[in-house]
């Protein structure tokens, strides 16, 4: 499409959170601290699930992939957001905006499917424990992880290619802290009904379909747990699933508020706050949730840290 009598937009201005310099400095320090905790926590999970022999199971293999996804997911937005908070020119090029949007959709969709794979793993462990090691073999787990990562390719390519092909001929100020679909779409100078219908269909397929798989898995899990005669067994089963349920609730709860709410109910400020929840806060909380609620992870962290300290002291 061609912009008649107008120059096509070549860069966007990310308005971010505020124009107050003092507030920007405070936000920079706050988000830098969160990002540091996010990286340390998720890399710690990746490390202990890689080196600790007690964590060489399908559940921790998927947790390792989730932590890697969280690192990649935050890497797409947070560094640029931090730079913008201390920079007078909050500019992102047209290509840079498309690239950021592509990887945001890619890692977001991949996480949706990975969470559903983790739910299936818990379903097999609780509902079919005698055949768990046979069903959840190394080959299947590897393909499930690869499939989860690659599931983000179709939606990210489709959404980004279609969005970037639309004409941007007028204003270029994006009222957000990164190039998310809805705020960028507001700058398009033609009717976007077809794109919005396609975006909704993609959302239902790549977000709600994995969520439905999670619901089915946990429905079967809950039924199985309630049929257990042992109170200890029920408590252990619920404890095994609780961390994953909290993560799913945080991720899907906040993401659905952004992409499934009617436009008329969304102010730019509320959208930014909700977006912060699943792009910045949730990735920080995931390793904390899995670490604090899981004795095996806490034990592995202690063993790993102790071993590293002893190696530094030349004990080994």
From Swiss-Prot:
Tell me which GO cellular component terms the UniProt record holds: plasma membrane
The entry's localization annotation reads: Cell membrane
Q: How does it sit in the membrane?
A: Multi-pass membrane protein
Q: Predominant location of this chain?
A: membrane
Keyword Transferase applies: no
Q: Which residues are exposed on the Cytoplasmic face of the membrane?
A: 47-54, 121-139, 218-237, 293-316
Segments spanning the bilayer are 26-46, 55-75, 100-120, 140-160, 198-217, 238-258, 272-292
Q: Give the sugar-modified residues.
A: 5
The yes or no answer to whether the keyword RNA-binding is present is no
One Gene Ontology term from the biological process aspect of the record = detection of chemical stimulus involved in sensory perception of smell
Q: Which domain of life is it from?
A: Eukaryota
Question: Which keywords describe this protein according to UniProt?
Answer: Cell membrane, G-protein coupled receptor, Glycoprotein, Membrane, Olfaction, Receptor, Sensory transduction, Transducer, Transmembrane, Transmembrane helix
The record places the following residue ranges in the Extracellular compartment, namely: 1-25, 76-99, 161-197, 259-271
Supply one GO molecular-function term.
G protein-coupled receptor activity
Alphabetized InterPro entries for the sequence: GPCR_Rhodpsn (IPR000276), GPCR_Rhodpsn_7TM (IPR017452), Olfact_rcpt (IPR000725)
Q: Tell me the PANTHER family matching this sequence.
A: OLFACTORY RECEPTOR
Q: What is this protein called?
A: Olfactory receptor 10A7
Report the source organism: Homo sapiens
Organism ancestry: Eukaryota, Metazoa, Chordata, Craniata, Vertebrata
Q: Which gene encodes it?
A: OR10A7
